Every structure is written in C-alpha cells, then in structure tokens.
Amino acid sequence: MLLSTHLLFVITTLVTSLLHPIDGHAVKRSGSLQQVTDFGDNPTNVGMYIYVPNNLASNPGIVVAIHYCTGTGPGYYGDSPYATLSEQYGFIVIYPSSPYSGGCWDVSSQATLTHNGGGNSNSIANMVTWTISKYGADSSKVFVTGSSSGAMMTNVMAATYPELFAAATVYSGVSAGCFYSNTNQVDGWNSTCAQGDVITTPEHWASIAEAMYSGYSGSRPRMQIYHGSIDTTLYPQNYYETCKQWAGVFGYDYSAPEKTEANTPQTNYETTIWGDSLQGIFATGVGHTVPIHGDKDMEWFGFA
C-alpha cells in the first residue's frame, strides 16, 4: 500500500462526501437508527445499523446503503437520503459499518470476493437475510448502493451474492475484483486499480465477477454505474472498466450500446444504456464522488 495515496483517498472521500448535495424531500424522518448485534454469523465483525420507517410497508423492500472510507453506518445514515426516502416509500434501510480503523471496506481479500467466503461481503449478506426474516420483507425487492469504497463493495455484493439483490447503484467505485490482493491482504489499497491502469476485456471482467459465485446461473441485479470525469481518487477509467464488466456479465456488446442520452439525468451527465440491466452515467466536470441521486435511485429500484 502506498500510504500517501491511501491517505489522499481517505481525505478526499471524506471532504467530498460531506459536501455533496442530496435530494430534498418534504417528508421527514420519524423513525430512529438502531444497532443490531444479533443478526447471525458475522465473520469480520461488521457493524449493522437499521432504519425502519414509521410507515413501514407490508412486505417492505430493503435498501443496503454502504458508506465511503472514513465513514460509518450512522454517518451514512446522516448524509445520504435513503432514510428520508424510506419514509416516503416504506422500505427498510440497512447501513453496514466497516470494522477497520480507516473506515474502508475489504474488497481485496479472497474471503470477501467469494460467496460465503467469510469476508465483509458475507457479513453484509447475513444482515440482508436476517432483515428479510425479521420484518417479512419482500426478497424480490432488495437493493444495494454505495459511495466510493461503498461503491466498490456494492459491485462486490452484486458479484458475490447476486441472488439477494434486484438492482444496484454504484457511485464512483471500481470493478468487482479490481482491488484484488494476490497476497490476500484484507482491506488492501491497490494503486494500480485506483489510477485506472487495470484494463481488460468485458469477457475477462465478467469471468472475474462470475468466479466470485462459482456455478451460479440465476438472475443478477440490474446495475447503474455513476462516475465523474475529473475523479483523481478512483480515476475515470474505472467507470469504463466497471461498465465493461457488467456488460460482459449480462451478455451485452460493450462496444455497441443501445443508446446514449446527453444531459441525462441532468446537465453535463451522459447516460449510456446497454439494455434493461445496465446503465452507465458519466458526469462531466464532477470529481470524487458523484453526488447521490436519490430520486433516480428510487426509479431504478422500482419504488417510484
């Protein structure tokens, strides 16, 4: 790990995340954030926090919202819009909290990159299954999202536990497996990946994701990928590599998307659509990280 680079990642992520505007809503939070410690096997001691709105829907959906480096579950509850949105749409929000001192997620070890491998991803998956059972949640309406390090983990969750999630939104992350450590370092930093120098084919990226749950042939979550053009923490090439990965997984021709829409969802954002299961949203002039578009997330998840 290059310490100076890692510190830059931590500091930049913290500052930009705190400055990001989020969607404003008239609906106010009326529930309260609660810590859960008995959700089952927790091999890496990941913290679990949950927000249950007062107007909880019958058979509610679930959104797993994963924080950035230096963050915590309670911190992401405070500066992301999902708890407020849950009051409007009646879903439950799970906020995992990193067990590591820097607040980043382990997206580098073999354990976390393997289905039921005993890593961070395993702990988060167990939070989901506990919540479905506890609250009678609709297992077909479970979604995952995250920013920066949390976006990396979102891609990992989509690859390691595709059976759990219907859709995902990824705010400024890297491809699943891009941070892989060949020395099996837990919570390791990968400068080569961060700087956009891990470049390969859609087919190769797909094979990396698919190997995380070997033999799985079921449905996979629809993916929506956001990235900024002037991101100097996780360089913009990571946007293209992530889109390649999921295009490969879904069998889309990465080089021939269905369409590209300028100034969508807002000015200077360009949306590329490969098919029903994959959209990429590239934000010109935006750094690290792209602000959360909560209303658009609700549309992608099917709540709105």
Swiss-Prot record:
Monomer. GO terms for cellular component: extracellular region. Belongs to the carbohydrate esterase 1 (CE1) family. AxeA subfamily. Activity is decreased at temperatures higher than 40 degrees Celsius. Its EC number is 3.1.1.72. Pathway: Glycan degradation; xylan degradation. It comes from the Eukaryota. Keywords: Carbohydrate metabolism, Cellulose degradation, Glycoprotein, Hydrolase, Polysaccharide degradation, Secreted, Serine esterase, Signal. GO terms for molecular function: acetylxylan esterase activity. It catalyses: Deacetylation of xylans and xylo-oligosaccharides. The active site is at residue 148. Its main location: secreted. Acetylxylan esterase involved in the hydrolysis of xylan, a major structural heterogeneous polysaccharide found in plant biomass representing the second most abundant polysaccharide in the biosphere, after cellulose. Degrades acetylated xylans by cleaving acetyl side groups from the hetero-xylan backbone. Inactivated by di-isopropylfluorophosphate and phenylmethylsulfonylfluorid (PMSF), a specific inhibitor of serine esterases. It is found in: Secreted. Residues 1-24 form the signal peptide. Glycans are attached at residue 190. Optimum pH is 7.0. Activity is significantly retained from pH 6.0 to 9.0. This is Acetylxylan esterase A. GO terms for biological process: cellulose catabolic process; xylan catabolic process. NCBIfam families: esterase_phb. It comes from Aspergillus awamori. The keyword Nucleotidyltransferase does not apply. It holds the Pfam family Esterase_PHB. Gene3D superfamilies: alpha/beta hydrolase (3.40.50.1820).
